[in-house]
């Protein structure tokens, strides 16, 4: 049977002290404890800065060898703009991004066997950035063609109308994962499956992000689930179980903004998948 590894997006939430981390636990102890309960984590610190070698060594020291750490490419590559507005001219541009790309890959490779998928997480692009998907896909094609071998890559876009077969075929040609994001305006994975096969590499990569505006109108702390995502989680579990039966591995990461408390949501999804596979 294929492997389904489920974890959270980041492990550093202080709101988890009590409901997940033991009372009194210090942040420097979080990852070691986390790795005793989950098999994988997605770190977002790499989006904001290229990780130092000492940071990488710290992750290695606090996790077992079979633990998987996925990471985001730096913001300078996928966003490239000042403040909230992306710079479409600089995004993926060799002159502006390849230096950071190389520095990022050199340092992140220090994870060795622990290294999971490296994700190009793009923001939503308006028509003033790209008139349609075509110019973006041209830039993406060139960037992917220049990526070095020896790593697993994934791409996440947040333009719903760009999720089409030609996008999937481009990723498939490079064996790059199509990252499926359960996010405010993006379709569920099973909706994508009705249009085309979203499996473009040797594994599926799913990010359960949620609706930031919706959940922050309810809470801004992350010690418990406050939104019932049972219906969507059941659909994700069905999709992941189907992939496992096709011998396709999966990585799934849950954000606090999805339901309110990522560790519990991740465990809930894991239990549901186990039930489905046991009864199938």
Question: How should each PLM-predicted stretch be described?
Answer:
Residues 1-280:
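Residues lining hydrophobic/aromatic ligand-binding pockets adjacent to catalytic sites
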């Amino acid at each position: 049977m294929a492997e389904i590894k489920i974890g959270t997006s980041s492990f550093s939430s202080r709101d988890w002290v009590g409901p997940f981390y033991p009372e009194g636990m210090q942040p420097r102890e979080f990852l070691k404890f986390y790795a005793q309960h989950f098999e994988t984590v997605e770190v977002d610190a790499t989006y904001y800065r290229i990780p130092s070698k000492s940071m990488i060594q710290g992750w290695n020291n606090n996790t077992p060898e079979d633990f998987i750490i996925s990471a985001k490419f730096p913001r300078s590559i996928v966003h490239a703009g000042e403040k909230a507005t992306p710079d479409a001219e600089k995004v993926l541009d060799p002159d502006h991004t390849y230096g950071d790309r190389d520095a990022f890959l050199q340092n992140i490779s220090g994870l060795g066997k622990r290294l999971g998928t490296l994700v190009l997480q793009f923001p939503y692009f308006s028509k003033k950035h790209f008139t349609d998907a075509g110019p973006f896909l041209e830039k993406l094609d060139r960037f992917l063609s220049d990526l070095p071998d020896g790593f697993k890559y994934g791409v996440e876009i947040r333009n719903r109308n760009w999720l089409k077969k030609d996008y999937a075929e481009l990723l498939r040609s490079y064996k790059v994962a199509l990252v499926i994001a359960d996010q405010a305006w993006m379709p569920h994975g099973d909706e994508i499956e009705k249009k085309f096969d979203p499996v473009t590499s040797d594994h599926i990569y799913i990010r359960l992000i949620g609706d930031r505006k919706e959940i922050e109108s309810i809470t801004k702390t992350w010690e418990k689930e406050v939104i019932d995502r049972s219906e969507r989680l059941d659909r994700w579990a069905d999709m992941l179980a189907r992939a496992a039966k096709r011998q396709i591995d999966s990585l799934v990461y849950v954000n606090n903004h999805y339901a309110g408390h990522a560790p519990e949501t991740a465990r809930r999804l894991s239990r549901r998948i186990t039930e489905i596979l046991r009864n199938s």
